[in-house]
Amino acid sequence: MKLNLLLLLFIVELVAAVTNYNLGSAPVSRYLSKTGTYSPVAASRVCNDNCYSFYEGELFCGKFDSNVSETDYLNCLCLNKQYRSNFEGCNCKSESEVNFFDWKSSCSDISSVKNYSLPTTQLGTCNSHCSAYQTIPAECLVYESGKYQEDQVCICQNAEFWYHYENCDCLDFGDVDHEYEDICYYATNSFVTSDDYYDSFFATYTEGSFESILEKGSFLAEQKGSITSGLASKTETSKVSTTTFSSNGTSSGTTNGDTRAETKSSNSTQTSSSDKNSSQINSISSTGVANFVASFGMGTLLLFVLSLC
């Protein structure tokens, strides 16, 4: 009888502790449907306008300075244009300074991303979001006015320290006569700077996808029109119709020869939904853990006292 009572009390305490833990570990971030205006002020609770969507919440990014040993900032977890989650509105320089479970991205430095913008199509100019860059003659063949012309391109080191080409209309390896085994970016996707997305974007591209050089030239001209009209942020010049992105930046895709551009809205929604779910799973609050330990600890102590009776 005594053993049955102890077992019953143990089960009751365990259920109560788990329930209390689940209530205490509710995610601190909340999903917002629109982007904010970037501000380096930590308490402003806004994200960089290069985000397609973002979460807003207390991510406990420690800022260390001479006056304050550690300050918890209100930060944005941003799903940015390169389909990678990163922290913004935070001065953290390394992943170790971010006290947030399982997110592998580090905080973006404010100064590295505040001037994010689409690149111009003027030769020899680089996007202002690059933290460092150099102009190089890539001998990138651009189809204009009925013939191919050589172009110059910028090799850019961006805030995440990935290298990529900008201001170049090359679409595959065969168009690039350069020692780097990378693909020149077409202008509409110059803002996509992740190597993972970069590689998968052209992974299924083949020159045979275009029926003729003329069709290729027309396609490039059409996409240049999108840049000029400000539509570049909504489309991708890809033959990939279905691309799945995970929160860590990896991706996979399938080819559809009839698809000339894919909208970013659906991909952004899917990815932000995935990141949201991941955030809800991973954002285990310290309060919830403490409540679990406290509840379970009291139950264990009670069982110990009863066992002595």
UniProtKB/Swiss-Prot annotation:
A lipid is attached at residue 286 (GPI-anchor amidated serine). One of its GO terms (cellular component) is extracellular region. Probable GPI-anchored cell wall protein that may be involved in cell wall organization, hyphal growth, as well as in virulence. It comes from the Eukaryota. Belongs to the IHD1 family. Residues 241-281 are annotated as: Disordered. Keywords: Cell wall, Glycoprotein, GPI-anchor, Lipoprotein, Membrane, Secreted, Signal, Virulence. The GPI-anchor is attached to the protein in the endoplasmic reticulum and serves to target the protein to the cell surface. There, the glucosamine-inositol phospholipid moiety is cleaved off and the GPI-modified mannoprotein is covalently attached via its lipidless GPI glycan remnant to the 1,6-beta-glucan of the outer cell wall layer. It is found in: Secreted, Cell wall; Membrane. The keyword Lyase does not apply. It is a lipid-anchor; GPI-anchor. Residues 1-17 form the signal peptide. Its main location: secreted. This is Probable cell wall protein PGA50. The lineage of its organism: Eukaryota, Fungi, Dikarya, Ascomycota, Saccharomycotina. Residues 287-309 form a propeptide.
